[in-house]
Amino acid sequence: MTINSSFLASKLTKKPIIWSISGADCSGGAGIAADIKTGHSLKVEVCHLITANTVQNSKRVSSINPIEVKILAEQAQALRIDKPPAVIKIGLIVNGEQINWLVALLLSLKAQLPDLLVVYDPVGQASVGDCLTTLSTIELISLLPLVDVITPNVFEAKQLNALHEKRSNNDTLNMAENILLLGCNAVII
């Protein structure tokens, strides 16, 4: 049997694929745009599933326009066909319907791709302070056991910490330990 050298070369030089599941920030400073910039600087291919179109700039958020789950499912199906992920990076999830869809997607992908790594940056508010999601912290419970690494800032860690009966208000180590007990494999605050 002969192996085509160009086929072999393409397999050996194939870039890892990251799926970014997040919002689109029209100012380019956050969300999908930031993930694409970061991914390209790391020499990986970035595919994106857009959860919301936000209208914002460096001063304020004017509107958040959630994408229907039906469209998210179509985006995921299109990518599953020829661009399966090595990593999924989750950012803005706008509502409970999106969480339910995401949990089902991750369960399916992890069954198909056992080495899949899931990173969650729990975006709840914009850098200008406006709330970006109607999602309650309690709705995240079903997602957290599917997350390999969660990267909350201190404010987000305090919100997640409120889900645990042994709350710790300011100690980042205790907050991280409590978040781990919610099902994540690793926490970076």
What do the PLM-derived regions correspond to, one by one?
Residues 87-89, 119-120, 151, 188:
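Generic enzyme active-site microenvironment
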Residues 47-51, 117-121, 143-155:
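Non-cysteine beta-strand/loop elements that form the S-adenosyl-L-methionine
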Residues 117, 121-132:
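Rossmann-like NAD(P)(H) cofactor-binding subdomain of soluble oxidoreductases
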Residues 1-87, 163, 167-189:
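Small-residue (G/A/S/T)-rich helix-start motifs and N-terminal tracts that mark the onset
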Residues 109-118, 182-185:
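A short helix->loop->beta-strand "cap" motif at the edges of active sites that frequently abuts
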Residues 93, 123-125, 155:
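Active-site beta-loop-alpha junctions enriched in small/polar residues
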Residues 130-189:
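Conserved phosphate/ATP/ADP-binding segment of small-molecule kinases
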Residues 89-99:
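N-terminal glycine-rich "phosphate-gripper" loop used for MgATP/nucleotide binding
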